[in-house]
Curated annotation (Swiss-Prot):
Site label Important for reaction specificity, positions: S234
Organism annotation: Cladobotryum sp
Domain of life: Eukaryota
Enzyme Commission number(s) of this protein: 1.14.11.-
Reactions catalysed: (1S,4S)-4-[(4-methoxyphenyl)methyl]-2-methyl-2,5-diazaspiro[bicyclo[3.2.1]octane-6,1'-cyclohexan]-4'-one + 2-oxoglutarate + O2 = (2S)-3-(4-methoxyphenyl)-2-[(3S)-3-(methylamino)-8-oxo-1-azaspiro[4.5]decan-1-yl]propanal + succinate + CO2
Subunit text: Homodimer.
Name this protein carries in UniProt: Dioxygenase FrzG
Gene name per UniProt: FrzA
UniProt entry keywords in alphabetical sequence: Dioxygenase, Iron, Metal-binding, Oxidoreductase
Enzyme class: oxidoreductase
Role: Dioxygenase; part of the gene cluster that mediates the biosynthesis of the alkaloid (-)-FR901483, a potent immunosuppressant that shows efficacy in animal models and a probable inhibitor of purine nucleotide biosynthesis by targeting phosphoribosylpyrophosphate amidotransferase (PPAT). Within the pathway, FrzG cleaves the C9-N10' bond to yield a conjugated iminium. FrzG is also able to catalyze the dehydrogenation between C7 and C8 which leads to a shunt product. The biosynthesis of (-)-FR901483 starts with the condensation of two L-tyrosines to yield (S,S)-dityrosyl-piperazine.
Gene3D superfamilies: q2cbj1_9rhob like domain
Length: 306
């Protein structure tokens, strides 16, 4: 798996992403950002219990959810509401957005928004997460095969060291282009003798950027006392429904402090990127930009003046 410094820029990083489906971006977050963000989310993690939220034990999906969430894993979501560093710095990461535009924007109707964000903390004694594709969230894409454009991509940044022993994400580079419909209908990828995974070993601030088609899963934590903590930020095509219902869960007071682009990532704007001369067709109020309808102020974001 290739490792490229963030300073290499989006072109080099995206080329490796297209080839392997995954790449380690070294120094994606600064040490200062890691420290300040970690401090802001610590109270929420302290209050959180490990494992999946309470559910109907008779539900067919209960066991699957327990395995995916992890019985000794904490998952803290809704980070926009918990961290100013997240909403004003991490969600505004310029390299990240340059890569997202390369992944999702091929024509004037294309765009993207945030699917979900969470801090994932794998405790000692945790079992490995089942190998899966994030694209399983959107079954039509999964069934259509590898030729489909990306539905979802993920950035997982290390907040603590990721090692082979403490639960570094296990990944299978190249599996974004070799799957079949039969494999997609069989969740037991662990039984595939041809599947080779490697641990995404990272220092704090490093990030794995990967396709929703890549097979991966959280590793087992075999240490006695090391918590493996990471930040996952996933993004989807704007025509798809996100996991987190941000327009119904993020307060207007918080949204008013954010940039136009940040608001668009949460669904408080009709589209991102904004392309001059292209009208709004999705997520509108009678064809008008939804943010203007609800009274959000126009702002400048990056090189786009709105």
């Amino acid at each position: 798996m290739e490792r490229i410094p963030a300073s290499a820029g989006p072109e080099a990083i995206f080329e490796a992403f297209r080839r392997d489906g995954i790449i380690v971006i070294e120094g994606f977050l600064t040490p200062d950002q890691v420290q300040r963000f970690s401090s802001e989310v610590q109270p929420g993690l302290d209050e959180l219990t490990v494992g999946a939220p309470e559910h109907d034990e008779a539900a067919q999906t209960a066991t699957v959810m327990d395995e995916m969430i992890g019985e000794k894993t904490k998952r803290l979501g809704q980070l926009v509401t918990r961290s100013a560093v997240f909403r004003h710095e991490l969600l505004e990461h310029e390299l990240m957005h340059a890569l997202l535009e390369k992944v999702f924007v091929e024509g004037p109707m294309d765009g993207y928004w945030m699917n979900a964000s969470e801090v994932i903390e794998i405790a000692p004694g945790s079992n490995a997460q089942p190998i899966h594709r994030d694209q399983e969230l959107y079954d039509v894409w999964n069934r259509a095969g590898p030729a489909m454009p990306e539905a979802i991509c993920n950035f997982i940044s290390a907040l603590t060291p990721f090692t082979a022993l403490n639960g570094a994400t296990q990944v299978a580079p190249g599996t974004h282009r070799d799957f079949t419909s039969d494999h997609l209908l069989d969740r037991d990828f662990q039984g595939r003798s041809d599947l080779k995974t490697i641990p995404a070993v990272m220092n704090p601030g490093d990030c794995i950027f990967f396709s929703g088609k890549i097979l991966h899963g959280g590793g087992a934590n075999h240490t006695a006392d090391e918590l493996r903590r990471g930040l996952a930020m996933s993004f989807i095509r704007r025509i798809l429904t996100p996991e987190e219902a941000h327009p119904l869960s993020v307060s207007r007071e918080i949204v008013d402090t954010m940039t136009y682009r940040g608001q668009a990532m949460l669904g408080f704007r009709s589209q991102w990127p904004v392309i001059e001369g292209v009208p709004n067709f999705y997520w509108t109020h009678q064809g008008s930009e939804i943010g203007s309808h609800i009274g959000l102020k126009e702002k400048t974001s990056g090189s786009v003046v709105l």
